[in-house]
Amino acid sequence: MVDAFLGTWKLVDSKNFDDYMKSLGVGFATRQVASMTKPTTIIEKNGDILTLKTHSTFKNTEISFKLGVEFDETTADDRKVKSIVTLDGGKLVHLQKWDGQETTLVRELIDGKLILTLTHGTAVCTRTYEKEA
């Protein structure tokens, strides 16, 4: 099932990203720059290791992990978090925990698009990606 997520995905729509970043405590200047970028996400698999790369004019990040195994992650906004990614009902669910807080990043495929739903407290952001040929 995870194979359906593999490939290169380009951001085409974003709703409430600034509110989500504000909820995380991201500063104004960083939010302004991050809101303007249109990142590309590349999801690859090598054996049982998944790699998720995000490339943008703002910042490039890369994480590699096994489904269901906790790992240390430094986020694009420099938070040091404990992360775990699971496959749940056809969705890739990425949970980040730090300093008594948590946020979820849920990726699902709807009508050939990758929908990323980011949740922190009451802040919910939806980002839509289309697969590149």
UniProtKB/Swiss-Prot annotation:
N-acetylvaline found at: V2
Sites where the protein binds octadecanoate: R127, T128, Y129
A GO BP entry: brown fat cell differentiation
GO MF assignments: cytoskeletal protein binding; icosatetraenoic acid binding; long-chain fatty acid binding; long-chain fatty acid transmembrane transporter activity; oleic acid binding
GO CC annotations on file: cytosol; extracellular exosome; extracellular space; nucleus; sarcoplasm
Subcellular location: Cytoplasm
Keywords: Acetylation, Cytoplasm, Lipid-binding, Phosphoprotein, Transport
Phosphothreonine PTM sites in chain numbering: T8, T30
Residues the record lists as Phosphotyrosine modifications: Y20
Modified residues (Phosphoserine): S23, S83
Domain of life of the organism encoding this protein: Eukaryota
List of residues binding (9Z)-octadecenoate: R127, T128, Y129
Binding site for hexadecanoate: R127, T128, Y129
Signal sequence interval, chain numbering: none
Cross-referenced Pfam families: Lipocalin
Family per similarity comment: Belongs to the calycin superfamily. Fatty-acid binding protein (FABP) family.
Role noted for this protein: FABPs are thought to play a role in the intracellular transport of long-chain fatty acids and their acyl-CoA esters.
Domain notes: Forms a beta-barrel structure that accommodates the hydrophobic ligand in its interior.
Protein name: Fatty acid-binding protein, heart
